[in-house]
Each structure stands twice: as structure tokens, then as C-alpha cells.
């Protein structure tokens, strides 16, 4: 069972992940977001759907590459506080290091991008 301090850190990291995903979506023109977060003792899932977004195939490919990086607990412990603190194109770099599984679905015709993120607790 998670201790209170551990839950606090878990919640803070979840908020950082959501913030980074939102920043990415706003950067590419999203006008409306739907966010669903579910946390239990085993995992946290984040489902974010962005509407009115326009990204190129290159950005989509790059996003997949960044998110597919293996989770790195040591880097996460050190760097998670850095997310959201600069204007560099790093939104998804830290997200990739902090998650265990993901999927991205993009409907170009409708301008809808969906992230499904899983993080084992």
C-alpha cells in the first residue's frame, strides 16, 4: 500500500504528465481537451483527447519515438521536477521516461489526437 508521502509524489508526477501532454496539444492548436485520469494501487492511466489539433506525419512519428523510450526510474527521480519549466521542444521527452506503455491515435480529417498513457505505480 502507498504511504501518504508516496501518494503525494505519485499525484504530483501524474499532474506533471498531464501538464506536458496538454502543453503539446496546445502547441499544435488544440481548442478543446478531454482528460480522464484513473489511479489505483497498481497503475495510473491517463486518457487525453485533443480536438482542433493539426500535426504533421513527422511530428506524429517523432512523438511515437519519444514516448517509446524505455522508462528510466533513475532519470525520473532526478528530472521529473524539470518538466514544464522551459520553452524547448521537450514535452514528450520526459513523459516517455516516466511511463510504461502508451498509444497515440490521430484522425487528421477530424483534427482529433488521443493519448492513452499507462504508468505502473
Q: Model-found features: residue ranges?
A:
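N-terminal presequence-like segments and adjacent domain-start helices
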Residues: 1-9
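Conserved ATP-binding N-box helix of the HATPase_c
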Residues: 8-38, 89-98
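Short, well-structured hydrophobic secondary-structure segments
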Residues: 33-49
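Glycine-rich ATP-binding loops of the HATPase_c
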Residues: 100-106
Amino acid at each position: 500500500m502507498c504511504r501518504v508521502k508516496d501518494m503525494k509524489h505519485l499525484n504530483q508526477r501524474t499532474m506533471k504528465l498531464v501538464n506536458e501532454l496538454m502543453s503539446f496539444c496546445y502547441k499544435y492548436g488544440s481548442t478543446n481537451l478531454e482528460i480522464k485520469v484513473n489511479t489505483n494501487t497498481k497503475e495510473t492511466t491517463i486518457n487525453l483527447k485533443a480536438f482542433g489539433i493539426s500535426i504533421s506525419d513527422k511530428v506524429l512519428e517523432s512523438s511515437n519515438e519519444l514516448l517509446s523510450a524505455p522508462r528510466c526510474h533513475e532519470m525520473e527521480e532526478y528530472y521529473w521536477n524539470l518538466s514544464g519549466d522551459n520553452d524547448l521542444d521537450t514535452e514528450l521527452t520526459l513523459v516517455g521516461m516516466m511511463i510504461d506503455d502508451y498509444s497515440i491515435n490521430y484522425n487528421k480529417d477530424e483534427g482529433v489526437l488521443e493519448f492513452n498513457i499507462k504508468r505502473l505505480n
